[in-house]
Amino acid sequence: MAGWSILELLRSNPEALKEHVRKRLMDPAIVDRAYRLDVEWRRLLTMVNEVRRRHNEITRMIAKAGSREERERLIAEAKRLLREREDLEEKLKKVEREREEALLGLPNIVAPDVPVGDESATRPIEFWGKPKVWKGHVDAFREQTEAYGFKVDHEVIEWRPRGHADMMEEVLKLGDTLRAARVAGSRFYYLFEDLVFLDLALLMYAIDFMTSKGYVLVLPPYMLRYNVMSRVIDLETFKDAIYEIAGEDLYLIATAEHPLAALYYNSEIYDEDLPLKLVGVSPCFRKEAGAGNRDLKGIFRVHQFHKVEQFVYSLPEESSKLHEELISNAKEIFKGLEIPFRVVNIASGDLGACAVKKYDLEAWMPAQGKYREMVSASNCTDWQAYRLGIRLVRRKGMERGYVHTLNATAVASTRTITAILENFQDEEGVVAIPRALRRYLEVFKRAPTDAIHPRRRPPA
């Protein structure tokens, strides 16, 4: 039976696991603690089993005792062994709790082709499209392309594009973050009319694209219990990012990845049913507590948004190939939207606990003169599956192990809207609608057909 890869590495080569932890810029002492507790747990478990075996043996001997003295001696020994077993079991329970906590605190390993370092070590691996680059951003553009050895064809424009926040609120007058802040706080928003239609069209476009590739469409729960959420992610690390429902054992999901990963909680999946490819659609709720003052304007970094999420349960030997498929799907989606982008290989120190490797797809934002994250695609191998108790059963030999899980954004609606507002505007403030979205707008009588035009006043 195949065990959890991290536990096997902890037992066979703890120094190698420490090196993976160091690559993530984490304290390797967590490996020492987990190793020590695992050794102690196995020692106590062996002792409990031995005392239990001896107690059962003595119990059988009592019935066969030849004299009263021998019977009383055996009964006394059985009572002593029972007390010893109870004491050992109490110690075992305590160590088992500490061991489980320590094991759940261990991150995944790091794939060999992941750049090592903090976020500055992240490296672009691919560029697509012909970005519009304002003349004042040409040097910054070259630092994000040529500095990494890529020569990216681009169009230099004389006029300065307006940021998505100004486009949304001042030019198109189809969004209002100030009134949202008065009633809900910062990082909330009202969207109106054409931008709402655009949000819906993006979701339908991504759903249509993913289901046409055979992914099963899922509308998941928007909340999860603590004992589930804490196993999908390292909740202690991310507790400031997740909303907890006061007085309830429930947490709002930050992405459909969370309930999709939990779909087979404490269950088995047979190898013949893999890969299981899902696409979830849901609202997402995020505190963004660590964002500080970044992206306060507009709707790039907000507390709630809609997202279409790719998720795959995989055989271990197929997860690397499927990781490439997930990022390929995202690339096709953004190529269809005609939004210039680059794909980056995320550095080890910025992976988070669960991924062995992560790609981000970043869209070019002409007003900012930067590539900004739109998509994350992660291979979590068996890290989530072990925590969630999702076992793989191979029919041949009925061998058991753990499935691999992978996830990737298809479309996050508000972020993608920001990219459309910046990439598809003209000097007059008119925003062309990507051609791939237009057929999804035809079902709405009042939706725009080919462009969104500036307004003199907001609709509400």
Curated annotation (Swiss-Prot):
CDD domains: SerRS_core. InterPro entries: aa-tRNA-synt_IIb, aa-tRNA-synth_II, aa-tRNA-synth_II/BPL/LPL, Ser-tRNA-ligase_type_1, Ser-tRNA-synth_1_N, SerRS_1_N_sf, SerRS_core, tRNA-bd_arm. Transmembrane segments: none annotated. GO terms for molecular function: ATP binding; serine-tRNA ligase activity. Pathway: Aminoacyl-tRNA biosynthesis; selenocysteinyl-tRNA(Sec) biosynthesis; L-seryl-tRNA(Sec) from L-serine and tRNA(Sec): step 1/1. L-serine binds at T255, A256, E257, E309, T409. It is found in: Cytoplasm. It is an enzyme of class 6 (ligase). Its EC number is 6.1.1.11. Its main location: cytoplasm. Pfam families: Seryl_tRNA_N, tRNA-synt_2b. It catalyses: tRNA(Ser) + L-serine + ATP = L-seryl-tRNA(Ser) + AMP + diphosphate + H(+); tRNA(Sec) + L-serine + ATP = L-seryl-tRNA(Sec) + AMP + diphosphate + H(+). ATP binds at R286, K287, E288, V302, E373, M374, V375, S376. GO terms for cellular component: cytoplasm. It comes from the Archaea. Homodimer. The tRNA molecule binds across the dimer. Catalyzes the attachment of serine to tRNA(Ser). Is also able to aminoacylate tRNA(Sec) with serine, to form the misacylated tRNA L-seryl-tRNA(Sec), which will be further converted into selenocysteinyl-tRNA(Sec). Belongs to the class-II aminoacyl-tRNA synthetase family. Type-1 seryl-tRNA synthetase subfamily. Consists of two distinct domains, a catalytic core and a N-terminal extension that is involved in tRNA binding. This is Serine--tRNA ligase. It comes from Aeropyrum pernix (strain ATCC 700893 / DSM 11879 / JCM 9820 / NBRC 100138 / K1).
